[in-house]
Amino acid sequence: MTLAPADLPASLQPLVDRALARLAQVLPEPIPANLLPLLTRLAVTSDFALDTLVRQPALLAQLAAPGCPPIPAPVLDPLQPSDWPAQIRRWRTAMSTRLIWRDLTGLDDVAQTLAGATALAEDCLRLALDALQQEFAQRHGVIADEHGIPQQLVVFGLGKLGGGELNFSSDVDLVYAYPQGGESDGPRPLAAEEYFARLGQRLAKLLDETTVDGFSHRVDLRLRPFGSAGRVALSFAAMDQYFQREGRDWERYAWLKARAVAGDIEAGEAWLQTLRPFVYRRYLDFTALDGLREMKAAITAEVARRELHDDIKRGAGGIREIEFLCQALQLIRGGREPALRERRLLVALDALVAAGQIAPEDGSALREAYLFLRRLENRLQMLRDAQTHVLPSDALDRERIAVGLGYPDWEVLRAALAVQQQRVSTEFAALLAPRKGQAAPDALANYWRSLPEGSNAPLLAEAGFLDANGADQSLRDFAQGTGVKSLSDAARARLDRVLPALLHAATRSPQPDAALKRVLGLLQAVLRRTSYLALLDEQPSALARLVDVLARSALLAERLAAYPLLLDELLDVRVSGPMPDAAGMLAECQQVLAVEDPESALRWLNETRLALSFRMAMATLDGRQGAVDSTRQLAELAQAVVVTVLAMAEADMHAAHGEIPGGRFAIIGYGSLGGLELGFGSDLDLVFLHDNPAGVDASDGARPLEPGRWYARLAQKVMALLGAVTAAGRLYDIDVRLRPDGGKGSLVSSLASYTEYQRERAWTWEHQALVRARGVAGDASLLADFEQVRAQTLGRERDTGVLYADVLKMRGRMRTELDRSDAARLDLKQGAGGVVDLEFLLQTGVLARSARHAALLQPRDTPSLIDALAVAEFLPEDTAQALHGAHATLLDVGLACTLDRRPRLAPTTPAIEEACAAITAACIAAELPFA
């Protein structure tokens, strides 16, 4: 909108006339007619801008130039330091006026205005610091580090400066630091602490002090360690010590946006990486809400005390509430989700929506409100270059703000503001809703608080516990344990709220006694990590979901107790949504390849695997997907992990020993991994292959290895990484006994020796195993060669009499040695009509028919093999359908046993009997009477 003089409200006409008359007096020529509408609007919007044009009349032509280009920065003469304040201030006021001009002409939107104000502050900081550093170097010398390289002051920008969102007339929150101690080498030497403190103070004065030319930027140094009482500049080591010992919750919010903005930016950004664990805790951290409640309470008290109810920053529904809301969610989850570690608010808001932590419609509403409030804030400050966030009380100022923003009057603007503030208040209140305390403690709460001295088994029996005496004793033991006794007052208060709620939830579960036992086991594991108590205290839905899961799954109870980070999954909206596909899981796993520290990368990969497999378990437990889908997903996840680990191992080998020029390496998955039917906790059957070109005798690195040793070392690294114990457990147990010649054979086989072995020496059972084998990682061309070897091996003509005899003999031996069935229960895997009978039937069909039916060589998983063998007429169609149902039934029951930590020995229900009968009948019809 460009306000024409004819559109100007009569009440504003005198103000505009006076402003334009002042400007006309200093201009060498009359005001161009084409600029009158814009200058009219400028006069309405900003006394500061008009004052600047009056003092710097040549600026008007620069602003009116096409595109409104930047004003060149001044050159500060090191011989004339007395001129620096005026030069910096005049440039800053000119560039600030340019920001207003670009806003009014529509060249910049709100976000660009905020970014422009930030860039201007940084430019002023760097301009001033560069000049001062030259002065200090001449007077005091420089301070070199241990390598003789001169050190620089590091200037951290916090708050909106760090986030690149500085409002028009904002102060700048700065913290000064320097890499290490020492003494300057000039004629008047200073110790590092004094040197950089003086430099920082001079910098603040050069920018902050008000002169006849105004000021550049108000500087606030109070966010430094120990606040106003602390040293002005600290070494990185002193900063580390402070945050390890003294860092408080509110400082996590302050440093979330921190950025090195001047001085040695590279060193500053590197140090900020070391601060990340302080800001973003490794685990889900609902304790961040405690700090937020304290800060919000302090601000609310200040608003009331100073009567700042019209403050659009600190008041209800204001800018600060949007910032707090986003930052709290970032702090809660940023340790687990790197995408949330974002300084810029709008980008963080988008990331929170993408992560499912803010609903898309709420995210859009918050974005709209934020931009509205920031635009209004800028216009309040543009009026007189004042650091204000309070709506004006003066009627003329109100009208100027409203008209400048395109509203007909103040009341319409105020109504629009109220709508946005209400949106923000609603979202913020939902995040910080006070916990609903019980009006009066109930019987179970009173019982818990009486422990360990008290005892009330009858109450527990009445509540629904079958073994009430045992439950009473377990709770008393827990209450008098060192873990509970050593809790802080705040953590004990959380436990006193959480445990009665857990007891209530346990009594409503199908198995109260099992639920209680598992609840106490979990609490024992998390007592020292108060962030998990905070999660259960702050999130009643997670608490109820937790007890439900604990009651139904011993396996998940164990995993939650061992790896409490999985509690996050109970709150993640993705846990009840669709699982990522194979490509999505690979992408999640391969994010760790960007992590430089191998130990951290491996822990992160373990955490990713735990989280994804937990989601699969939840989907299975809830009945949202069957075991056939879950076991396929588990195999795809394992493959993604193997691909990632191979990349890590190869990078390590390349760094240490170089590459084998032209060499190829691949990993083959056998068993349930190859057959896409992996269970929870299953090991991985792997075979390693390599192919080395003729004439290459060694790797090309600084410490060369001959090819055989190089590939063996690579395979060993893969196995070591997969089996390494981290804080998040180990990835997988590995079994490599299916390689040629088993335990006696080489760990890594050449393609040629593998081909020869399969052709000349492999047993029938090894060819059966090859039916499910597939390449899972490594060189694509070698994997293609493996497929060709596999096809040639499986597709050759066979003596069916010998084949059937070998299969029957092997199955009989396995049945004798491995079947654990008894009169009342069936071994789902090894029993008569069980999963292995079905696998042997399908493998025999492939070996018997694939010479004439090449399509049988493609499938690896059981459902696809059944379909392919039906097409090849090895199985009648009705038999194939019956086998699909039988397979799904046995897999569902088996996975249910695994999830509840029961052996896969199931009572023979009608469904199981029907499944086993179908498999047995199919085997007999195929002349494979395994029973």
UniProtKB/Swiss-Prot annotation:
GO terms for biological process: regulation of glutamine family amino acid metabolic process. The keyword Nucleotidyltransferase applies. The keyword Magnesium applies. It catalyses: [glutamine synthetase]-O(4)-(5'-adenylyl)-L-tyrosine + phosphate = [glutamine synthetase]-L-tyrosine + ADP; [glutamine synthetase]-L-tyrosine + ATP = [glutamine synthetase]-O(4)-(5'-adenylyl)-L-tyrosine + diphosphate. Its cofactor is Mg(2+). Residues 441-931 are annotated as: Adenylyl transferase. Its EC number is 2.7.7.89, 2.7.7.42. Keywords: ATP-binding, Magnesium, Multifunctional enzyme, Nucleotide-binding, Nucleotidyltransferase, Transferase. CDD domains: NT_GlnE_GlnD_like. Residues 1-434 are annotated as: Adenylyl removase. GO terms for cellular component: cytosol. It holds the Pfam family GlnE. One of its GO terms (molecular function) is [glutamate-ammonia-ligase] adenylyltransferase activity. Coiled coil: none annotated. Gene3D superfamilies: 1.20.120.1510, Beta Polymerase, domain 2, Nucleotidyltransferases domain 2. It is an enzyme of class 2 (transferase). Involved in the regulation of glutamine synthetase GlnA, a key enzyme in the process to assimilate ammonia. When cellular nitrogen levels are high, the C-terminal adenylyl transferase (AT) inactivates GlnA by covalent transfer of an adenylyl group from ATP to specific tyrosine residue of GlnA, thus reducing its activity. Conversely, when nitrogen levels are low, the N-terminal adenylyl removase (AR) activates GlnA by removing the adenylyl group by phosphorolysis, increasing its activity. Belongs to the GlnE family. This is Bifunctional glutamine synthetase adenylyltransferase/adenylyl-removing enzyme.
